Amino acid sequence: ATGVSRKTLSVPGENEFKGRGVSYCGVCDGPFFRDKMVAVVGGGHEAVHDVEMLSETADKVYAIPGKKGYSEEFPELTYLRENPKVEFITGADVKEIGGSEFVEYVTLEGSNKGRLSLDGVFIILEHVPTAGILGEAGVSTDEGGCIFVDRDMETNIKGLFAAGDCTCEGMQIVTAAGMGAKAALSAMKHVKSLR
């Protein structure tokens, strides 16, 4: 299992507050922040999705795509900009995550610098697939390193199957488990065909 790793902000407070207000998954940890004030840091589609999802339960969601902004104009941004529970903070990067026992604030630098009081920070930066050796072996990947598979979970190399986060699909344990089961069945079928 190669999976993926997440890019981090690498700012003071990030490691200290992991699990105490710093999260890397809105789907996983969002329910803990019902009626709280949170920030979603990231400019990709997954970050936009988490802003949308968290706005349904959190009291306030600060969307902080970073100084570079969003990687593209995602369709969801149109109605999220009209959502009174969502506030976009552009032109700023998170410089520090702080608090005492739990996250209490982030410090921003850039055109919108200052301190923002909140209860949680969702760091939703791009995933970095850890399947580099497979790419070197000729397995087809996209520009981000995600492994391409067909509907049977087979890669471009006959008899080599991939499933889960390394394919960058779903990014949830339950999805990976289902894909793994499908890949295992396909692999068994392939082995039987060799007899």
Q: What are these model-derived regions, one by one?
A:
Residues 43, 66-68, 165:
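Cofactor-binding loop segments of dinucleotide-utilizing enzymes, especially the Rossmann-like FAD-
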Residues 5, 10, 15-32, 125-172, ...:
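FAD-site-proximal beta/loop scaffold in flavoenzymes
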Residues 48-52, 166-195:
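A conserved FAD-binding loop/helix module that cradles the flavin
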